[in-house]
């Protein structure tokens, strides 16, 4: 799964990963998710030729059966050897509600890649007090931090938006705040850092984590 808050660049990154895997000879199936009934992301990914199923009207974390059904449809139509799932931008607690059930029920059929959570560097710098700007509500910050708390890989996207020194400071701050995660830098737009991220996703199965507490 590739998660992250709204505006982190998830769909662009999913497309880049799918293109990378396809070029390497892998068959890819994509699953998109949103709270609305019309998923623009689905149309964009399908326009690039990727087999894509969508789960509208609710998050993976409360529609696990729909996620499994979508994977089943892709298996019947395309027989992908890699699934990439993009949860809704406000979704959290994915390890407890998606990863653990998948591993328990379908452990013989699926290998679970590390959970990547993308961040917009400008927003992250504001959330963690590294730059000035409009403040977010406590509820937004709570969800934002919880998403990062369960990540195996925290992926700073849109690296072209900050100066190198600011990116280094942000990366160090995220590593300090979330020591269980590996922090990477990429730009899905320019391609910078994508190979290193893709290698981390495909080379390691998701590590076992304690289920986090969500209020």
Show which residues each predicted segment covers.
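Nucleotide-state-sensitive switch-loop elements of NTP-binding domains
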Residues: 1-3, 8, 12-142
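Canonical P-loop GTPase G-domain recognition
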Residues: 141-155, 159-215
